[in-house]
C-alpha cells in the first residue's frame, strides 16, 4: 500500500471510530435519563409477575399509585414527607423532601419520580397529584385497568356500585339495625 492510501485509511478509520464513540456516549446519556413507569405491585412482584423484571435498586423510575389512608408521616422540622403508595396489591414507601402539590391527599392518585433506594422504597425527586376526582395519568389508568381486569375487579367494584357491594351494604345495614334493637 502506498503512503497516500495509508493516510486515507487512517482518516476513514478515525472518522468511523469517532462516530462509534459519539453514538455510544449518546446512548449512554439517553439511558441515564429514561424513567421507566411502574406500579407498586410491579415493583414488588415484577412486571407481569416476573421477578426478573423488577426494577433494580439505584434505578430511576416513575411510580403511579394511590396514597394509602393513614400512611402520611410529616417531619415537623423539615419538609420531609413519607407515605405509602399502592394499587390493588402491595405498597411501597415513598420519601420526599419538598412542598407537596396542593391536591396531594390520602386516598388520591399520585405519580412519584425518583430513585429506588431499597426494593420497596423510593426516594422521590418529584411528586405529582391528580388534578381532580376524575383525572388519572393515562399510564396509571391503563396499568390499573389491566390489573383490575386480571383480578376480576370491575369499574363498578371500584366505585362501590356493583351488585356485590350493594348486597354487602344491605347486610351491614341489617346487622346494624339488628344490633340497635
From Swiss-Prot:
Compartment(s) where it occurs, according to its Swiss-Prot or TrEMBL record: Cell inner membrane
Keywords for this protein: Cell inner membrane, Cell membrane, Cytochrome c-type biogenesis, Heme, Iron, Membrane, Metal-binding, Signal-anchor, Transmembrane, Transmembrane helix
Signal peptide: none
Ranges of compositional bias, category Basic and acidic residues: 135-148, 156-166
Entry binding sites for heme: 131, 135
Sequence ranges on the Periplasmic membrane side: 30-181
Record family assignment: Belongs to the CcmE/CycJ family.
Function field: Heme chaperone required for the biogenesis of c-type cytochromes. Transiently binds heme delivered by CcmC and transfers the heme to apo-cytochromes in a process facilitated by CcmF and CcmH.
PANTHER family: CYTOCHROME C-TYPE BIOGENESIS PROTEIN CCME HOMOLOG, MITOCHONDRIAL
Record protein name field: Cytochrome c-type biogenesis protein CcmE
Amino acid at each position: 500500500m502506498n503512503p497516500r492510501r495509508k493516510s486515507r485509511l487512517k482518516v476513514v478509520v478515525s472518522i468511523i471510530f469517532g462516530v462509534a464513540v459519539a453514538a455510544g456516549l449518546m446512548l449512554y446519556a439517553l439511558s441515564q435519563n429514561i424513567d421507566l413507569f411502574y406500579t407498586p405491585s410491579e415493583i414488588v412482584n415484577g412486571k407481569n409477575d416476573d421477578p426478573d423484571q423488577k426494577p433494580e435498586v439505584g434505578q430511576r423510575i416513575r411510580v403511579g399509585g394511590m396514597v394509602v389512608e393513614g400512611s402520611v408521616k410529616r417531619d415537623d422540622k423539615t419538609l420531609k414527607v413519607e407515605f405509602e403508595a399502592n394499587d390493588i396489591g402491595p405498597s411501597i414507601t415513598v420519601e420526599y423532601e419538598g412542598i407537596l402539590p396542593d391536591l396531594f391527599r390520602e386516598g388520591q392518585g399520585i405519580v412519584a419520580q425518583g430513585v429506588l433506594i431499597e426494593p420497596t422504597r423510593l426516594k422521590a425527586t418529584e411528586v405529582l397529584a391528580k388534578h381532580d376526582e376524575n383525572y388519572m395519568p393515562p399510564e396509571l389508568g391503563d396499568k390499573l385497568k389491566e390489573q383490575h381486569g386480571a383480578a376480576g375487579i370491575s369499574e363498578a367494584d371500584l366505585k362501590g356500585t356493583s351488585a356485590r357491594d350493594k348486597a354487602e351494604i344491605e347486610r351491614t345495614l341489617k346487622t346494624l339495625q339488628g344490633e340497635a334493637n
